[in-house]
């Protein structure tokens, strides 16, 4: 699959163009320069041709602590790409930053196809002349408005004209999981270690990742997609519109995932923010693995330290009592294999199907062994249980009247199912239904 990278100075509309090509909002768009910091990847399609598209941060000369990292990310993207879109703005005109980028592309991308694109042509006045553009040495250029879609057909035709026809990536084969956590717990370091390259900006200052970013990779011949997300801050600290949108992006990333890696910083006490993020995982009701990062930073560890930390996690994250816990050091690439071993364990449990006869045998016996307490004028009685298709183990329990169910008895039945069929590392859902109501399809 061919790869196309979009490069340019800040605020020329790179993310708007990225979103326009994909026909959906993937990158954060804002008038504030420097909003895109990492390389963002997604698969585009035009005229039955598939291609990988990369959005990059803006290149400028600046004292911004992130700028050197952003420029390095752009160079990574240029090296990966077959074709480069060099984007300038008709609204702002050509300046020294554009000229420096043109010079860099001549040096770093001399064997690649570079397409010069002038964005924001919906403006009434153009602050450049065509001779200035031709002086860059990239030949003809395209005039577009990414925001309004003007000129996009011609640009896309040019992008794909030499590409072979091929099918889209079979994303259904890939297991998709996201990495969440408060800022600066090491989410991007973990992503980089897994991918084997520095695709995400890693900086000691909290909040260096704003976009959620999809990365396809293989591990031991199994296909995965990993989504790194912006760190979730306390509500009082979300002051920028961009930060608010990044939190929403984290929630959307969770919705698109089959599993969550909840990353904690093991080198310091767990914080209220950690519990807030853990609450997002609980609300999602999908498999979750708690990843204790920076384990090598803990001094004076002994044979009991790991168990003590596990006990603390179980105390603070009672609502994730079923979630497995692993200990890693992302920066040092230590114990990363335990994440994938645990992912496969959790996947197997999430997909496990129980024979209806065995399920009923266990639940009916449990119901008879421990008499349910009277509640709201009656006592719950289970007559039949069936497992239904879902992303996590889900069971419908036919009973005399669901209003008679006390929460403590529901927990007892859930625990009996977990013990009997080995569902100790995944969430499970029980639906209590009047036995006179039929399930869909019955």
UniProtKB/Swiss-Prot annotation:
Database matches in InterPro entries: G_ENGA, GTP-bd, GTPase_Der, KH_dom-like, KH_dom-like_a/b, P-loop_NTPase, Small_GTP-bd
Keyword Protein biosynthesis found: no
Domain spans labelled KH-like: 352-436
EngA-type G domain residues: 2-167, 175-351
Entry-linked CDD domains: EngA1, EngA2
A Pfam family of this chain: MMR_HSR1
A single GO molecular function term of this UniProt record: GTP binding
Superkingdom of source: Bacteria
Keywords, alphabetical: GTP-binding, Nucleotide-binding, Repeat, Ribosome biogenesis
GO BP of this protein: ribosome biogenesis
Residues that hold GTP 1 according to the record: 8-15, 55-59, 119-122
Amino acids binding GTP 2: 181-188, 228-232, 293-296
Complex and partners: Associates with the 50S ribosomal subunit.
Function: GTPase that plays an essential role in the late steps of ribosome biogenesis.
Recorded family membership: Belongs to the TRAFAC class TrmE-Era-EngA-EngB-Septin-like GTPase superfamily. EngA (Der) GTPase family.
Identification of the protein by name: GTPase Der
């Amino acid at each position: 699959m061919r790869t196309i990278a979009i490069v340019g100075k800040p605020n020329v509309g790179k993310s708007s163009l990225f979103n326009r090509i994909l026909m959906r909002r993937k990158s954060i768009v804002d008038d504030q320069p420097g909003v895109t910091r990492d390389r963002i990847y997604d698969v585009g399609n035009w005229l039955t041709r598939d291609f990988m598209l990369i959005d990059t941060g803006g290149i400028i000369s600046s004292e911004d602590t992130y700028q050197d990292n952003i420029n390095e990310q752009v160079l990574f993207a240029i090296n990966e790409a077959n074709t480069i879109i060099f984007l300038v703005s008709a609204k702002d005109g050509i300046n020294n930053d554009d000229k420096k980028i043109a010079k860099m592309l001549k040096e770093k991308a001399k064997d690649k196809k570079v397409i010069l694109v002038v964005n924001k042509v919906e403006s009434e006045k153009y602050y450049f002349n065509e001779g200035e553009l031709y002086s860059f040495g990239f030949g003809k250029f395209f005039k577009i408005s990414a925001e309004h879609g003007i000129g996009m057909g011609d640009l896309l035709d040019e992008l794909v004209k030499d590409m072979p026809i091929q099918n889209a990536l079979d994303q259904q084969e890939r297991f998709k999981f996201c990495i969440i956590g408060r800022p600066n717990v090491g989410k991007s370091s973990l992503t980089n270690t897994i991918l084997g390259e520095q695709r995400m900006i890693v900086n000691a200052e909290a909040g260096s990742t704003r976009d959620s970013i999809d990365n396809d990779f293989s591990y031991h011949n199994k296909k995965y997609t990993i989504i790194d997300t912006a760190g979730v801050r306390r509500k009082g600290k979300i002051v920028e519109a961009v930060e608010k949108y990044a939190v929403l992006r984290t929630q959307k990333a969770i919705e698109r995932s089959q599993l969550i890696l909840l990353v904690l910083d093991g080198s310091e006490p767990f914080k209220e923010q950690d519990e807030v993020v853990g609450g997002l995982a609980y609300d999602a009701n999908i498999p979750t693995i708690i990843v204790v990062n920076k384990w090598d930073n803990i001094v004076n560890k002994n044979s009991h330290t790991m168990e003590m930390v596990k006990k603390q996690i179980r105390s603070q994250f009672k609502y994730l009592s079923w979630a497995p816990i692993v200990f890693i050091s992302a920066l040092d690439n230590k114990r990363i294999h335990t994440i994938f071993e645990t992912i496969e364990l959790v996947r197997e449990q999430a997909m496990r199907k129980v024979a209806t006869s065995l399920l009923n045998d266990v639940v009916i016996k449990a119901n008879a062994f421990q008499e349910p307490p009277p509640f709201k004028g009656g006592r719950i009685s289970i007559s039949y249980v069936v497992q239904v298709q879902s992303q996590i183990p889900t069971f419908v329990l036919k009973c005399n009247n669901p209003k008679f169910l006390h929460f403590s008895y529901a927990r007892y039945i859930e625990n009996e199912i977990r013990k009997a069929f080995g569902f100790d590392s995944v969430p499970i859902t029980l639906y209590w239904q009047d036995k006179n109501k039929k399930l869909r399809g019955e």
